C-alpha cells in the first residue's frame, strides 16, 4: 500500500472517531495494523475481555513472531488461566491450558509443567512464585505495566503507537477543498450550489435543470457534533507498504458452471483453499518466445505490512509475581545477530556424479534417502544417497514407437535429443512419472531396490510435456500433465485412459498444482503469458484468470500441511519473485526479498517443515522463514553450483538435493540427515543386496517419527541412542547363538517393591527415560524413578542402580475404576502423555485420566459397557483417541468435546491392539479374533482386512491377544501372537516375514521393537526372553530364566506377561512378571549388545533397516 493510501486510512480513522463509530474504529485499527490504540488495549485488559484483547493484538503480531510477542501472549493467557483457577472454574482452566498455553510447552516445557501443576493446588498462591498474587483487579494492573513495556520494546509495534498530528476533521476539510475546486471549474457557477452527493463530481446545472444545489462552502454533510478525536501524539515514522486487494473477488468461483472471465490484474487474488499434496518444485527451462510484460519488482507494492526484523533489542524484565518465561536463544542487553537455524540442511554430505546435467529431482515420499533424477539428455537415475549407490540408470527410449503419433515420430527423427522436464513420485512411492520435452510421459512402477518396471507410456501433448503431477479425483489415482499445446490433461494412472482435457490457456502451460479443499478437488495451472487458472474436474472451463508476478515462468506450491500457498516466478528480464498468497482475502500476502537483481535462469523453489522456503539463485541456495520477507540465509554448498540450481527437499526436510556444475548433485544435510545417511551407509556396508522375501529398506529421520507401542502408545523419539555395532563379516567364523544363563552374564535388576501386587499387566518406560510405570491386575499403578546422583549423572534408567518406588506426599494411589468387573477378566490398558505428566488408563471400568505428579484423578469418562481394552492417541491430534472396546468396536473419541466421532466395526471379538502410521495416514487394528484391519484415518473407512496366518499344526486359545506395533519406517508393522512373530507391509497387508513358535514350545506372551527397531524383544510362557534381529526375524540371543529368576521361583510358573523397550537406549528393556515383579535388563558393559546378528540367509542380509534416532514401544502421545 502506498504512503498516501496509508495516510487515507488515518484520515478515515479520525473521521470514524469523530462520528463516534467506536467499534468500527478499533476494527479498522486491527485490520490495517497501522495504529495500535494503547488506551483501548488497556481498557480491554482492565475489563478482562481476553478474546477481544487477543483479537486486537492479532492485527499487529502473532504468537511466534518474536520473543516479545510470545511473552505478550503468554502473560495474557497465563492471567486468564490464573483467574479461572481463582474462580475455582477447573474445567475452564483446563480448557485454557490445552487450547492457549500448550503452544508454549515447546519453548519451555518445565514452565508448562509447573503451570499444569497449579491445577492440583487448592490455591495456586501456594506456589512460591505466585504467593504475592493479589486480587484480580490489581493483578491485571500489574500485568498491564509489563505488557506496555513489552509492546513498546517490540520492533513490530515501532511507529504504530503514535497517531499522526492532524487538524480536526481533516478528511472533511479535504473534501470541502475538492468541492470548492470543482465548483470553480463549473461553466455556469451558481452562487448557492446545493451539494447532495459525493458519488459524482460536482457541476452546477442550468436554471431549467431539476437539481437545486446548496452552498458549496457549507461543511460536508452539514454541521455535525464533533468528538474529541485522536490525541495529537506526534508525526508518524516510515512504514512498510502492504499488498492492496484487487477488486476481483473469487467468492463463489466453485459454484459457477462455466468459464468466468476476470480482468487480469498484477498480483491478483487467488482465493482457494488448502491442498492434500504439496505441489513440487519446477525446473527452469527455455520456454517459447513471448512478448515482454512489465510487472512490479519485489520491492514495490507487494510487501507484507508486518515485517519481522531479525535483530531483537533489549529484553524487558517481568514482575515479581509473574512466573518467569525464558526461551531458547534469549539474549540480554544486546541485539542478536541472526544465525541460520540448525534444522536447515547446510552441510554437504554427499556429492553424486550423474553423468548429464540434472533437470529435475524428487526424493521418495517414504524412503527418505532415495533420490530420483531426470537429466537434459533424457536419462533417469535412481540413487540411494546414503550408500552413494546409483541403483538404476536408464536412457530415453520410446517403448512402443508403433503406438506413437506421427507428429511425435517426426519430431524424434528431426531432433532425437530429448530432455527430462520433470520427475515425480506418486504419494505412496509405488509409481513415478517422467515428463519429457517431446510429447511423451512415461510411468514406472517401483518395487524396491533396483526393481523398476515399465507401467504406462502416454503420447500426452503435441510438443513438450512441461509438468506432471499425481492427484486423486474421486479417490482414483490420476496423472495430470500440461504442455506446449496449451492444454492440461488428466489420465487414469492404472490404465492410461484420458479422463479430462482442460483448454483455455493462450500460451504453453508451464506448471500445474493439483489441490483439494474439503471435498472439492481442482488444479492450478500457470502459462508462459503469466496467466494463472484454476480448473475443477468437470470440463466446464477455467474458474480463475489472473496474472502471476513476473508474468512468465511461474510455479506454485503449498506448505507441507497444505495451509499456505506460495508461487515462484521469473520474468523474461530475469526478475524473480516468491510470494505468499492470502487465500481467504484473495491477495498477495507478502513478497520475499533477497533475489539477485537479474537472475541468470529460471529460479526454482521448494518448501519444507511448514516453515522454510528455499530457492536456487545467484550460484547459491537462499532460505527464507515463511513469516519473514527478509532473506534468512544463503549457502553456496562449498561452491560449484549452477547459476540457478535445481533444488529438492526430502519429505522431512533433513536432506536437500542441489544441482551443481559438471553434472554433479550435492546433497545437503542437517544433523538428522547426517545421522540418517550414516546409518544407511553402515548398514549398506554389511550387505549389498536385500535377502529373498526381505522387506524393502525404508528410512525416516529422527525428529518426526513416532512409533506406536504394544501398550497402545506412540512415542516421539528425539534422543534415541542406537548402538551401531560392527558385526563380524568373517565367513571363517562359525556363528553361535548367544545364551545368557547366569546372572553374571548380563545386568539385570528386580525393582524394589513397597507393596505387593499379583501380576503386572502393562509396562511403560516414561518418555524421559528416567522412570518405569506399571499397571497391575488389581488396577493399581506403580511408578519407579531413577534419581540423578554421583553414580548416575544422567538420572536415566539403568540396571546398575535401583530406582525408588515413587509416591506423592499425600500417599494416594493411582487406581483405576473397576466397576463390577472381575479383575481377572478385565483387560487393562493405558497410554502415557509425551511430557510424562498424564496417564490415561482403564481396567475394565471407566477410563481415568491421572496426574503423574500428584497421582490425582483429573477425569473419568466412558463407563462400560462396552469396556475399553486398548488406547492409542492420534499422531496428529492429541485430543483424538482410538479406543478399542470389548464389544469388538473401535471408537474414535474427541476428548476436548467429549464426543465419539466415529465407531469402526470390522472385528468379531475384543480389540487387542491399535497402531497409527502418520506416514500412511492409517490405523491398524488387531483383535482376539486374530484379524488385522487397516483403516484410513481421513474418513475412517476400512481399507483392508486379513486373518492372521496361524502356523500349521498350532491351535490357539479362543481369546488369544494379537498385538501390532509399527516399525520405525511407519510402513511395516510387527504382529505378535502367542503362536508367532510376523512382519507385515501395510499398504498390501502382506506378510513379509514370519517366525512361528514350534508346536511343542511355550507360547509367546509379549514382544516389542527396540527403540531403533533393529531388535525385537520377546517373552515366553516358560520365562525365556529372546532377542531377534528385526531385519530377518532370526534369533540372536536367548536369556534363560536362570539368569534373572531365583532358584526358589524356577518351578513356580513365574513368567513375563509384558515387555517394554527403553525409549533411547536400544539395548535396554524391562519385563513385568506374573508374580507382580518388574525386571530391567541390559547387556554387560563389556559386550554392549545382545549377541551377534546371525549370518544372512543365502549370503545376503535382509533390508529392514533402522534409523539412528527413531522408535519406541511404550508411550502414547506423538508430537502433533
Swiss-Prot record:
Gene3D superfamilies: YVTN repeat-like/Quinoprotein amine dehydrogenase. This is Topless-related protein 1. Residues 34-92 form the CTLH domain. It comes from the Eukaryota. Signal peptide: none annotated. It comes from Arabidopsis thaliana. Its main location: nucleus. The lineage of its organism: Eukaryota, Viridiplantae, Streptophyta, Embryophyta, Tracheophyta. Residues 1099-1120 have a biased composition (Polar residues). The N-terminal TOPLESS domain (TPD) (1-209) binds directly to a 12-amino acid LxLxL EAR motif peptide. One of its GO terms (cellular component) is nucleus. Overexpression of TPR1 leads to constitutive activation of defense responses.
